[in-house]
């Protein structure tokens, strides 16, 4: 029997979502929790995130015995071994041919800025940043929407066969004392969102022109090589 696990995690506790040499990845921790329940099949993840990046909605799949008929009980037991940095939201039975990574239709991320006074208790979960022109940020983010070759918005080391991506949503909105950048696409390159966020901030700061941002999006020339900090970034949705 194959199951789909929907979960969230605190990225500060891990070196990234993928398995790591010293077993410090989200995948390692969740696999370890499953092993306590007698499930030793390879755990597959729908998305990868870097060190310090969080997820409010992540998905994994694993093969388990047919005797796990009570999935709510399995969820409860799995949470015992996953807490405090991973929380299992739901477990569903899926078809045997379900591909947790390749069946994905879209992924969504949110990048959170706080404009309030700095707090060390929040520093790992938001990017503290002065207030900016939200309307202007929306205009700049709009440049990303559509089918793009984002080769200049990609960290090295990825396993992508192509740098072409279709961005469905790239927008900014306010919530209380936060500003949030929301991205939705058919897929993302390694470091794409953090490079995109940093590039938009550079334009807002007057350190990069709109023309230069457009040229980087159009794959003509790379003007920004810097990434926004990982702590403000959240994987927020995966749709099949």
UniProtKB/Swiss-Prot annotation:
Top-level EC class as recorded in UniProt: isomerase
Reaction(s) catalysed by this chain's protein: uridine(38/39/40) in tRNA = pseudouridine(38/39/40) in tRNA
Domain of life assignment: Bacteria
Amino acids binding substrate: 109
InterPro entries, alphabetized: PsdUridine_synth_cat_dom_sf, PsdUridine_synth_TruA, PsdUridine_synth_TruA_a/b_dom, PsdUridine_synth_TruA_C, TruA/RsuA/RluB/E/F_N
Alphabetic keyword roster: Isomerase, tRNA processing
Active site: 50 (nucleophile)
EC number of the protein: 5.4.99.12
Coiled-coil blocks: none
GO biological process, one term: tRNA pseudouridine synthesis
GO molecular function, one term: RNA binding
Alphabetical list of Pfam families matching this protein: PseudoU_synth_1
Quaternary assembly: Homodimer.
Family stated for the protein in its record: Belongs to the tRNA pseudouridine synthase TruA family.
General function of this protein: Formation of pseudouridine at positions 38, 39 and 40 in the anticodon stem and loop of transfer RNAs.
Name used for this protein in its record: tRNA pseudouridine synthase A
Species for this entry: Campylobacter jejuni (strain RM1221)
Phylogenetic placement of the source organism: Bacteria, Pseudomonadati, Campylobacterota, Epsilonproteobacteria, Campylobacterales
